[in-house]
Each structure stands twice: as C-alpha cells, then as structure tokens.
C-alpha cells in the first residue's frame, strides 16, 4: 500500500510520520525549508511522554517524482487545494483513493447523497469545479481530522492532542478501501472508525470551526475565554443554531446539542484556534470552507443566516487587511 501525504505540514506530517513509523510505504509532498530539512535529516515527531522520533520518508516538491499512489491524503488548507489540484495528477492510478482531510464542508458533499440535491456543486469551496473535474468525486473517501499539531521548526512536528481520523464513504458503505486504510491507521496507533454517516461528523466538527475560528480571529481570544464569556458565548450559540437548522434540512443528525459543543471547546482551555494562529502569522485565513460554504448551503436550503453572514463579512475584511493581501 502506497500512501502519499500532499501537504506535509502539521497534520499531514503527523499522520505521515505515524504511518511511516509503523512500516507503511509513505511519501510526502512539501516545499520550502520544511522540504529541505526533511530531505536532509528526515522528519522529527515530538509526542508527550515519548522520546523524539526521527523518521525517514521519501519527500518531494514535485509529485511527478513520487509516482502513482494507492491513497493520497490531502491535508492542505481548503482554499489552497483548487490551485494545486492539477499538479496532483501524477499521483493517481485508476484506483487511487483521495482522502479528503480538509476543514469545513467538502467540495464533494453532494456526491452520492441522493435526492434532488444529488451532484450539486459548491462554488464557495470548489470555484470553477476544479476539484470535481480533476479528481472526480468517485475517488474520494471522507475524513474528519481531530488531532492538533504544529510545525515548531522546519522538519519538526509537535503533536498536541487527539489521534482520531474518522473515515466514511460518501454513500455510507463500508468499502474495502475504507477498511484497509482504517487498518493501516490503527496499526500506526491511531483511531480510525469507519462511519456510515460521515457527513454528520463533518457537521459536528464544523460547528466549532465556523464559530470558534472566526470569532477568535476577530477578538484574539483563546477558546476558554470565547466559550466562558457571556457575550461571545451567545455569538457562538447563534451561529451554531443557524448552522444546525441548515444541517437538519440536509438530513444531518447532531448527536450532541449546542451547549455541549461549546462546553467541549471550553474544555480545550487556553488554546488559540488555527485561524487566530494564521492571522498572527499573516497567513491566508480559511474562510470559504468553514463560513462561505455554510452561507451557500443556507441559500440552497432557503435558510436565513444573519449572524453567520455578519461574521463572514467582518472576518473577510480582516483577511483583506493582512499584509500579504494589501496593495503596495
């Protein structure tokens, strides 16, 4: 089984390192200083309670150097994927599976969902249908990523918490490809349940991303503060309730309620969301997949989203004022 990690940053590097350490045939696509360091000295993984592990993996900037793979984990920021989709083609053979591990509503959401919305395409996450046309939705295996990790310097990844990668076919079947990947991940010491309704799990994680992330970027507050302050908690609540109404219209079952989801965020403690970290580093913000997509789904289901619309407008302007986006 050949597994490629396309985007060997924090999460991609973590799962790739765990798989490689367990004996899987892993390659990675990376760039810059991170790529150079991994080529020279391998990838170092730091985990609490364990000695640092230096893992040698095949790594390249050009996917053509790596050849066709059985599984390709896409672990980039969602907004980056359409721009590199065509460059992934050398990694595919006829039966290659794409493991979609990005945040938010995935581009393939309406593939094999059934009903009148079957095959609907989402411009907020797949402008110009680039992923749908280049990848093809039949290749996709859904994945909800739970671990938190960070690249503390080129070639070194620190695992923070979590070890679950939930998998699921768009049509809900327990396929051979999902079972084989689940076994590989479990052999690497990770949790990898195969879900019949992966979209339900996508929405529960999205609840946190669509509210915690932008509000933290607007306030510079950590999760514990956001969830415990009366006023910011109310903003989180109203956004989640709007999203819940959309999800339920699409057939999603939410196994927990809004208060439980917010309390779960509070329990993480004094943690900066990924969007706040990106803001502080002047990196592009992951807005469309976690907010724009929900706004688009609100329009599709004729569900008003006034609070989500307001937060989307304000955090989008914040994004435009980043040094990387300012006109010189």
Roles of regions detected by a PLM:
Residues 52-152:
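Rossmann-like NAD(P)(H) cofactor-binding subdomain of soluble oxidoreductases
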Residues 30, 88, 177:
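Flavin (primarily FAD) cofactor-binding/catalytic cores of flavoenzymes
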Residues 221-307:
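Interdomain hinge/lid region at the active-site interface
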Residues 1-47:
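NAD(P)+-binding Rossmann beta1-loop-alpha1 motif at the extreme N-terminus of oxidoreductases
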Residues 318-324:
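Conserved small/polar residues in nucleotide/adenosyl-binding loops
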